[in-house]
Curated annotation (Swiss-Prot):
Residues 75-178 form the EamA domain. GO terms for biological process: purine nucleobase transport. It is found in: Membrane. It comes from Arabidopsis thaliana (Mouse-ear cress). Its main location: membrane. Keywords: Membrane, Transmembrane, Transmembrane helix, Transport. This is Probable purine permease 5. Signal peptide: none annotated.
Length: 361
């Protein structure tokens, strides 16, 4: 009797969840104009193309003779005028005024800019010492850190599915660490490999903290969600991160060293310039696409696209840069997908229960 009553309950719960997803998808499609979905499509495409391209270009910089972590960190935020150029028409044509600055808002931008500069520097160490496919898999742990810091700082719900995703993604990172012997480049020492591993995880943790603090900034200080406000935040944070990274470039004399580095770069000065310019463009387009997806859709949608770009980067790195792809790394990739799926399921379940409670009240 117990078994016969249990199975239909589980089946019903799963099918009910699927039907709710279909219903909410249909309602969302009918509620928005066609232009909304076109913009969302191009924003998602920007994430899925620009972020993997940026990762591969960063790795190409180091594999072809680039040495400076500061240069690749500086390039990551040097494309901030691109977002500024997209923001300006909203002021001109929509007659929208810029958000007034106050002391708390300026301090928030400075703190987030400093953290972003530090985050980019940590990831630069990862790109210097790790294959692009490995650094991409490790960077996916930022989702677990985002969930954890979101719970601690923004008080976002942390249900069993989200906790499961944190545990699974952590296990995937441990598997990569165990496979260091087959994953490490011959010219990279053990200490350099584990330094890249460490800074990739630290960068992912800091990225999760930045995400939570950015969400808190929207909730506490900006007080409203609109696209131009999201663009303003991105411009100001990128600008302050650019300022901090420029100071680092000046102190380390890397501006003077760029000409010498370009001459010794494998492929010549032209390729060196192209790698740096396109790194700046692709990274900023990826960030802009992610900002648009967060505004047009949801955090869950951004998480889905973030999950999809991990295998895209890994497969592209194996094909284009001949990264090693062992059985351990494939297992880690599968576990990462599992963790992402669990997170997405937990987030959608929380959103559904929140909407149900608000509608009933």
């Amino acid at each position: 009797m117990d078994e016969t009553t249990e199975r239909p309950t589980v089946s019903f719960s799963y099918s009910n969840w699927i039907s709710n997803i279909k219903k909410s998808t249909r309602e969302a499609y009918e509620a928005k104009p066609f232009s909304h979905w076109i913009l969302l499509f191009f924003s998602g495409a920007a994430m899925l193309i620009a972020f993997p391209a940026s990762s591969l270009l960063s790795r190409l910089y180091f594999s072809n003779g680039g040495k400076s972590k500061w240069i690749i960190s500086w390039v990551a935020v040097a494309g901030w005028p691109i977002t500024c150029l997209i923001l300006l028409p909203t002021y001109i044509f929509q007659k929208i005024k810029p958000t007034p600055l106050n002391t708390k808002l300026v301090l928030s931008y400075v703190v987030l800019g400093f953290l972003s500069a530090a985050d980019n520097l940590m990831y630069a160490y990862a790109y210097a010492y790790l294959p692009a496919s490995t650094s991409s898999l490790l960077a996916s742990s930022s989702l677990a850190f985002s969930a954890l810091f979101g719970y601690l700082i923004v008080k976002n719900p942390l249900n069993a599915s989200v906790i499961n995703s944190i545990v699974v993604i952590t296990g995937a990172m441990a598997i990569i660490a165990l496979d260091s012997s087959s994953d490490r480049y011959s010219y990279i020492s053990n200490s350099q490999y584990f330094a890249g591993f460490f800074w990739d995880i630290m960068g992912s943790a800091l990225h999760g903290l930045i995400f939570a603090l950015s969400e808190l900034l929207f909730v506490k200080l900006l007080g409203r969600r609109s696209f131009h406000v999201a663009l303003e935040q991105q411009v100001m944070v990128s600008l302050t991160a650019f300022a901090f990274t420029t100071i680092g470039m000046v102190v380390s004399n890397d501006f003077q060293g760029m000409s010498h580095e370009a001459k010794s770069f494998k492929g010549g000065e032209s390729l060196y310039t192209q790698v740096l310019v396109w790194s700046a463009v692709t990274f900023q387009l990826g960030v802009l696409g992610a900002t648009a997806v967060l505004f047009l859709a949801s955090t869950v949608m951004a998480g889905v696209l973030n999950a999809v770009r991990v295998p895209i980067t890994s497969v592209a790195a194996v094909i284009l840069m001949h990264d090693p792809m062992s059985g351990f790394k494939i297992l880690s990739l599968v576990l990462t997908f599992w963790g992402f799926s669990s997170y997405i399921y937990g987030s959608s379940s929380s959103n559904s229960s929140t909407q149900a409670s608000s509608s009933s009240s």
